[in-house]
C-alpha cells in the first residue's frame, strides 16, 4: 500500500439481489484524512459506510481488475450506527467504562509488576513495565476519567446521569451516549452517519474543532454543509452508482463540480458543432462526383 494509506477499496461492486447499489468503487483513506461522502438520498452513502465497517460484503466485478479491500495492518474501525443498547439496566458509567477495559487490564498488570519488582531485579520485568507505560500513554489511560467527564460536559449530559440506567434515557440521549463512547474509543477510522443530529450549536461547534484536529481518519455522511466545510479535506461523491474523489471541503467540491459541468457543456457544444460541420460537408459532397470518377466516365 502507499505511504500513509490506512484503508483501500478496489473496484468494488455492491448489489442486493439484482439491484446494483455501488459499481466499480475505488475508495482510499489516508492517515488523518477527514472525508465526506455526499450524493443524493438513496444513492448508497450509508451502504458504503456499512461496507467499510464490515457489516456487508462486496461483490467482485466481472473484469480483470484486482478487486478487494486492503488495510495497513490492523485498523480499528468505529461506526456511530443506529443505537441498540442491549443491556438496558446497565448504568451509563458502566457502559462507557467498557471502552476502557484495555486500560484497566494494562493498569492491573502494572500493579502486579510493581509488586514483583519489589523483590526481584529481573530486567525483563522492567522492560515489560516500560512497554505497558508507553501503551497506557498511547491509550490516554492516565486521563480516562477526566476525558470521560469532559465528553459528557461537552455533550450537555449531567455527571449525575452517569449513575442512571441506559434504558431510562430517550433515543436522542442514548445516541449522545453512543457518540461519547465512540469518541472515547478513538478508533483508527471513525465512521459518522449524520453526527450533528440531536446536538445543539455549542456542541456542534466543539465537535467541529475536535474532529478537525483528531489524529486519525474520519469519514462523515451529513446534510450539514457548514459542518462539512469546517471539518473535511476530502470529498467523495456517489453519482449513478459510481464514486469520484475530490480534494478539499464541501465548498471546494461544489466549485470543482460546477467547473466540470461547465467544461462538459462546452465540450458537448464543440462536439455538436463538429458533428454539424461534418454533416454539412457530407451533404454538400455526397452527390458530387470526384475528379477520378469524372475522368473515368469520359
Which residue stretches match the model-derived regions?
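Intracellular alpha-helical coupling/juxtamembrane segments of multi-pass membrane proteins
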Residues: 256-278, 282-298
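ABC ATP-binding cassette signature C-motif
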Residues: 1-268
Amino acid at each position: 500500500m502507499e505511504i500513509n494509506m490506512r484503508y483501500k477499496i478496489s473496484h468494488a461492486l455492491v448489489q442486493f439481489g439484482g439491484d446494483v447499489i455501488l459499481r466499480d468503487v475505488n475508495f482510499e483513506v489516508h492517515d488523518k484524512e477527514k472525508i465526506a461522502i455526499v450524493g443524493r438520498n438513496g444513492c448508497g452513502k450509508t451502504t458504503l459506510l456499512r461496507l467499510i465497517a464490515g457489516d456487508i460484503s462486496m461483490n467482485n466485478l466481472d473484469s480483470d481488475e484486482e478487486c478487494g479491500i486492503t488495510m495497513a495492518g490492523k485498523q480499528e474501525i468505529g461506526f456511530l450506527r443506529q443505537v441498540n443498547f442491549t443491556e438496558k439496566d446497565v448504568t451509563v458509567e458502566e457502559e462507557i467504562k467498557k471502552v476502557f477495559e484495555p486500560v484497566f487490564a494494562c493498569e492491573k498488570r502494572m500493579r502486579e509488576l510493581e509488586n514483583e519488582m519489589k523483590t526481584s531485579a529481573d530486567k525483563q520485568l522492567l522492560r515489560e513495565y516500560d512497554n505497558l507505560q508507553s501503551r497506557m500513554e498511547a491509550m490516554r489511560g492516565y486521563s480516562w476519567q477526566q476525558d470521560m467527564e469532559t465528553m459528557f460536559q461537552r455533550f450537555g449530559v449531567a455527571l449525575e446521569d452517569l449513575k442512571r440506567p441506559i434504558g431510562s434515557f430517550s433515543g436522542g440521549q442514548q445516541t449522545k451516549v453512543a457518540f461519547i463512547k465512540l469518541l472515547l474509543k478513538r478508533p483508527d477510522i471513525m465512521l459518522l452517519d449524520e453526527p450533528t443530529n440531536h446536538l445543539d450549536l455549542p456542541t456542534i461547534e466543539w465537535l467541529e474543532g475536535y474532529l478537525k484536529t483528531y489524529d486519525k481518519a474520519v469519514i462523515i455522511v451529513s446534510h450539514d454543509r457548514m459542518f462539512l466545510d469546517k471539518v473535511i479535506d476530502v470529498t467523495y461523491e456517489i453519482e449513478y452508482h459510481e464514486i469520484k474523489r475530490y480534494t478539499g471541503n464541501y465548498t471546494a467540491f461544489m466549485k470543482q463540480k460546477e467547473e466540470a459541468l461547465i467544461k462538459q457543456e462546452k465540450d458537448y457544444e464543440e462536439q455538436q458543432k463538429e458533428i454539424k460541420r461534418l454533416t454539412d460537408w457530407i451533404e454538400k459532397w455526397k452527390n458530387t462526383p470526384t475528379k477520378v470518377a469524372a475522368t473515368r466516365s469520359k
